[in-house]
């Protein structure tokens, strides 16, 4: 259980904790609770996105993080919350999440041997009552009925009316609201993100801050993959990691030029490095199982050629092997 009266009292040194050259005053909670995310000591913070998230926590701004999949949008919010000891819950707004899931519903309970109908609160009323941050993942994939529930909470006072209960919930002073999205509310123009919707512009206006999180620089990404896979911390291992990240960069460039429809995220590179160890350091086999088999069949030859260029090894999918 969270203490509804808990307040953030500990001033955070942004230079020391996040490496930010900023005088913004941000306070966190003194104690960690079970709802506070675990700290990932290897996490690399994007300065602009971190500032937006910190402003959200410090000044109760509504913050949306937009970017391609695998850039670490949700994790970014969680890792900031972890260092502020701020309780945080993530809700994935897939097409199965309904208004009832968010608001709550009547449920039958046994009380003194009798069946009694009581209102079972959903995640949103619970979050509003507590000093917690709620993160709506895949915000642009939410159903229309769900989006209109969230729209009311996005307003300045953020009160939520439970019509069934004749109750108006006033948010806890330490309640915070964040969202992540692959698109920025204008629908998917790339064809990559099936199921995403255009977001009502009246609703987009209610987000105080919108930050774009792009892929990391080559060196920063290689450092993260290495931190997640310390067994590669040898001269040969570091070279392999660098080649893996370079291949990921090639897929992203090809994607932006319209030559590929599948892109390698940092998450995929980390998985590739881990899988290569599982398969007795067979980097090519691990690459095929981790990424290549996810690609469109017509694009696999192009991706296999990227691999051959970097690792000097022909894969079964490459043009040279097929021609032979």
Q: Which positions does each model-derived feature cover?
A:
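AAA+ P-loop NTPase catalytic core and its hallmark functional loops
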Residues: 1-238
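Alpha-helical lid/collar subdomain of P-loop NTPases
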Residues: 1-33, 43, 50, 217-222, ...
């Amino acid at each position: 259980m969270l203490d509804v009266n808990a307040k953030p009292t500990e001033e955070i040194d942004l230079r020391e904790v996040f490496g930010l050259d900023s005088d913004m005053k941000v306070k966190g909670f003194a104690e960690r609770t079970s709802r506070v995310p675990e700290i990932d000591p290897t996490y690399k913070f994007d300065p602009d996105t971190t500032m937006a998230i910190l402003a959200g926590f410090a000044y109760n701004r509504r913050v949306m993080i937009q970017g391609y999949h695998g850039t670490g949008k949700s994790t970014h919010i969680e890792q900031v919350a972890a260092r502020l000891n701020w309780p945080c819950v993530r809700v994935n707004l897939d097409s199965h999440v309904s208004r009832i899931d968010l608001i709550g519903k009547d449920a039958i309970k046994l009380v003194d041997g009798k069946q009694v109908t009581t209102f079972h609160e959903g995640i949103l009323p619970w979050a509003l009552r507590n000093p917690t941050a709620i993160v709506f993942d895949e915000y642009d994939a939410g159903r229309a009925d769900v989006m209109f529930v969230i729209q009311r909470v996005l307003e300045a006072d953020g009160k939520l009316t439970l019509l069934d209960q004749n109750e108006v919930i006033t948010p806890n002073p330490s309640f915070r609201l964040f969202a992540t999205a692959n698109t920025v509310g204008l629908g998917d123009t790339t064809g990559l993100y099936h199921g995403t919707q255009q977001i009502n512009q009246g609703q987009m206006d209610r987000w105080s801050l919108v930050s774009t999180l792009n892929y990391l620089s080559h060196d920063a990404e290689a450092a993260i993959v290495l931190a997640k896979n310390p067994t590669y911390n040898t001269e040969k291992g570091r070279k392999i990691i660098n080649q893996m990240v370079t291949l990921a960069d090639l897929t992203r460039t090809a994607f932006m030029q319209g030559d590929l429809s599948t892109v390698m995220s940092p998450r995929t590179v980390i998985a590739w490095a881990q899988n290569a160890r599982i398969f007795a350091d067979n980097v090519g086999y691990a690459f095929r199982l981790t990424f290549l088999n996810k690609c469109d069949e017509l694009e696999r030859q192009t991706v296999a050629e990227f691999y051959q260029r970097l690792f000097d090894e022909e894969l079964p999918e490459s043009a040279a092997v097929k021609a032979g």
